[in-house]
């Protein structure tokens, strides 16, 4: 099943997925929204800016400048932009996408202005276009280096989910399917906020007891919000939630965890963002999750605490004391 795939978004994650598709035998073209970045990839045949460990792209992967003019060449479009650029990317696609083409999203987060799920944004703009989400515990560098990785493909259309599953899967990359696109998105987005929380705790040297408690209670918070939004309970113990939460909270390859680590060590927000020097999705997602939880009357103490640190200049040590001395309660 050889296909022609367009990848929009040439960060580390978009590039790693483009590499995976090329290794799988597909013809892949990748585009960055920055013209100079495209020129670098075309000239050097690599993406050293985001994946320096990959010396050269395989023969089936090349950069492309004017993707709109060449849209007819592609079977599927993979969107791997930051969440801030997702809506505008889909709006661009609306102007040129063909009826037989479909979309795969590798973006995690919520819409920054409406706090809607990204699938809702895509369905609103392109109501007749098939949509799937690829999510789960996966660092770009490890995938690019063909280390074993397992993820989930979520779509309301199980047949389309299976199509995407076949598109990506090989001996190094295993895709499972689900129709719970809400749960898969909530897990993949909120874990970025909790990774910041975990980083703050690590930066303050709180130890592994606190780390374990944070992941466990954080999972409970994700589940509460997800169920309120219409997700299935089983999704939250799978790869898209628990798996991704464990990965992102526990390893400094995570930009969100590193950002939190710097905050816990005493840096300001701006200093920490500058030190990470890349998009920290959890910083923006914290505001969306906070507002969604308030709207739906969902108690999320860890998320609320992280929001206060990020947006209300709360002192992390005061926040920890408040969390630990809240009214005692039953675990469930």
Swiss-Prot record:
The enzyme's E.C. designation: 1.1.1.94
Molecular function (Gene Ontology), one example: glycerol-3-phosphate dehydrogenase [NAD(P)+] activity
Gene Ontology BP terms: carbohydrate metabolic process; glycerol-3-phosphate biosynthetic process; glycerol-3-phosphate catabolic process; glycerophospholipid biosynthetic process
Keywords: Cytoplasm, Lipid biosynthesis, Lipid metabolism, NAD, NADP, Nucleotide-binding, Oxidoreductase, Phospholipid biosynthesis, Phospholipid metabolism
Task of the protein: Catalyzes the reduction of the glycolytic intermediate dihydroxyacetone phosphate (DHAP) to sn-glycerol 3-phosphate (G3P), the key precursor for phospholipid synthesis.
Name under which the protein is recorded: Glycerol-3-phosphate dehydrogenase [NAD(P)+]
Catalytic activity: sn-glycerol 3-phosphate + NAD(+) = dihydroxyacetone phosphate + NADH + H(+); sn-glycerol 3-phosphate + NADP(+) = dihydroxyacetone phosphate + NADPH + H(+)
Entries under PANTHER family matching the protein: GLYCEROL-3-PHOSPHATE DEHYDROGENASE, GLYCEROL-3-PHOSPHATE DEHYDROGENASE [NAD(+)] 2, CHLOROPLASTIC
NCBIfam families xref list: PRK00094.1-2 (NF000940), PRK00094.1-4 (NF000942)
Domain of life: Bacteria
Coarse class of the protein's main subcellular location: cytoplasm
Pfam annotation, one family: NAD_Gly3P_dh_N
Catalytic residues (UniProt): 191
UniProt family annotation: Belongs to the NAD-dependent glycerol-3-phosphate dehydrogenase family.
Pathway: Membrane lipid metabolism; glycerophospholipid metabolism
Protein localization: Cytoplasm
One GO location term (cellular component): cytosol
Binding site for NADPH: 13, 34, 108, 140, 255, 279, 281
Residues that hold sn-glycerol 3-phosphate according to the record: 108, 136, 138, 191, 244, 254-256
The encoding gene: gpsA
Species whose genome carries this gene: Francisella tularensis subsp. mediasiatica (strain FSC147)
